[in-house]
Amino acid sequence: MDGDTLLDQVERAERALVDASRRSVRTDGDRPDTQERTVQDDFDAIIAAEQKIEPRDWMPDAYRRTLIRQIAQHAHSEIIGMQPEGNWISRAPSLKRKAILLAKVQDEAGHGLYLYAAAETLGIGRDELVAMLLEGRQKYSSIFNYPTLTWADIGAIGWLVDGAAIVNQVPLCRCSYGPYARAMIRICKEESFHQRQGFEILFTLSHGTPGQRDMAQDAVNRWWYPSLAMFGPPDADSTHSEQSMAWGIKRFGNDDLRQRFVDMCVPQAEVLGLTLPDDGLRWDADRDRYAFTPPDFDELARVIRGDGPCNRQRLAHRRRAQDEGAWVREAAAAHAAKRSGGTP
Ligand code: BYC
């Protein structure tokens, strides 16, 4: 599977991160002695040299705000993303499947924690981020507003949703902000396993009884377009891509990554013996890529606005969990204060 290639890319990004930390940046540039150097010049030099911006470094306010928005949205997605899969933990078809799914859902919680911690290095508290999610002031990925109707949906989420997540996130391992890049390296290694377990569920179903095969095909039919939409609006309508790429936060535009995902999935669908629900899908020899029908971007906009099939249910569930967990947070804070000899 292409997952190997993506993992290779993660390892290269990890090596580049270590190499970058060993190089120093020349911040004097070609500037004449008469001109005073600004913090903005230093920031630009670090970005241009493919070094990492660290929490202690000066950064433009807009760079900080963009990172908080993207990292928080990503963290919220991991946490909300536990719901559609958690829905199947008690109904997984065997003990082995249950144990694997439990581990995967726990991984998503872990990813949320690494990401909230990365956002906190930008000077914002986790309480504030969670409040913004619950009040609808920050977003989470559109994909988690679709329901998981059958066991095959767990396979389709692993194969397609985690597959899309990896294609989108491997370039983020090279993000210019150090704490986000480091979190992404760890997350991508785990996502690669998640994608394989989804592929394996679908492979088992597609080689099972006719009923299991139909269930697998139906799940792929329903998850294909929402997965394509995960990459965001087309570049021409993307508010942030250009500036985020100039800052080295995003490395590729939304359309480029969507295309890579399609090119990765088509041969994998053949191995599964399943079809992708797009009559327009064909090899385009001139472009050396697959031509495909894009997702319905009006639907994406509706889901992002809060009008997807499960938006209200997802947020209501999250708010309930937050309320019900209040006593745990209070007890943990009281315990920590007692141990340090202070008051909560
Ligand atoms: N859903 O200018 P654009 C996972 C918003 S976790 C909702 O292109 P950007 C997993 C966008 O925020 C998956 N909103 O934005 C977890 C912006 O609105 P605002 C999450 C979306 O940021 C558990 C507006 O549309 N992955 O995979 O440059 C289990 C214009 O868009 C979406 C990440 O978060 C969307 N799909 O690019 C299994 C990865 N798309 O904020 C799996 C990190 C766009 O101006 N994030 N919007 O009001 C990114 O890479 C980028 O933020 C995006 C969007 C590519 C998603």
Feature map (PLM): residue ranges:
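Glycine- and acidic-residue-rich phosphate-binding/metal-coordinating active-site segment common to enzymes
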Residues: 175-226
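Alpha-helical scaffold segments that form or flank carboxylate-/histidine-based iron centers
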Residues: 63-74, 92-111, 154, 179-191, ...
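Helix-loop segments that flank and shape redox-cofactor active sites
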Residues: 57-63, 81-103, 165-180
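Conserved alpha-helical segments that form or flank metal/cofactor-binding pockets of metalloenzymes
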Residues: 22-40, 104-132, 199-202
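Internal, conserved structured core segments that host functional sites
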Residues: 146-197
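Extreme N-terminal leader/anchor segments
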Residues: 1-63, 95, 326-344
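Extended, helix-rich structural scaffolds rather than catalytic motifs
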Residues: 2-21, 214-344
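Acidic/His metal-coordination segments adjacent to aromatic residues that form catalytic metal sites
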Residues: 52-72, 132-158, 175, 208-212, ...
